[in-house]
């Protein structure tokens, strides 16, 4: 999908190609120097604005819009109301994006309570430094407490951050987000191949892993929709009775089965080795994704990771749906299912639901979707994995 960034507060001005048609639709003559003030409280204005500002781009394949920097400086509130502009515009843009049977979507800044209904939240023009990376990790997890489940950060930072190691570590955090998205003021250039061979290889491995994990990620997002659970979960959401769950903001659950604790400090040596302390919740077995090393839950471990890895753990005893790498992971159908299982404890019996639909339209609301239960059991030393018929 193509998404375009928009700063709409100036409306349609007299220097723009669509100005004459817009003015005529508004019942006014197109005269140089004459402009209509952007007015989100006027339905006629907004209908004409959406039509003439967006229609041409929509026909070229734009799926939805990134509403940027629309902070109440034309009017203090939406005219005729006491509502701030941002949540109202997020509502309008969300509904506009639903045309042609597409799902409503958008990127935007946080607009206050209730705003989670519409956009994927954009966290603003962040500075590129280690403290900001650390802050975004905690923000993403704790905002789920307010129903804000999906974030689209400027990975690497919008300003500054001319550090290849920092860039690679930020992308590792992006692996465990609803959106793995790059954006900056333009200097430095955030494209992964601009950061030297070591960082580029690290980032490439993250993008490839993101593709392989997409069946799990998409199924987990479906769970957000049906069960109202955040995608990035502070540890106390799943383990409210554990005191340690409240003491470790550096880590979070990504769906039911993955635990991440991204590196937020500079490493040492040529391999950029950095350490991170991780609390592993009790009553489960955990496996380091990169090394495969097994840990019993209910303890702290200190992970030393070079630039090509970070503390990423998988809960044992569950089937996790994956796929082979594909370079068009969101538009290609799932053709080859990979079910990865990390051994659980004796007697384990658990399931995971793989969810599939077309990824773009609202046809799933009419039942055009599939859920496939994956079962795992370990009994008397015998492991059994079952892929049940899709429903």
Residue map of PLM features:
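Catalytic-domain carbohydrate-binding cleft regions of carbohydrate-active enzymes
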Residues: 1-309, 315
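Accessory, solvent-exposed terminal regions and/or long lumenal/extracellular loops of proteins
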Residues: 309-391
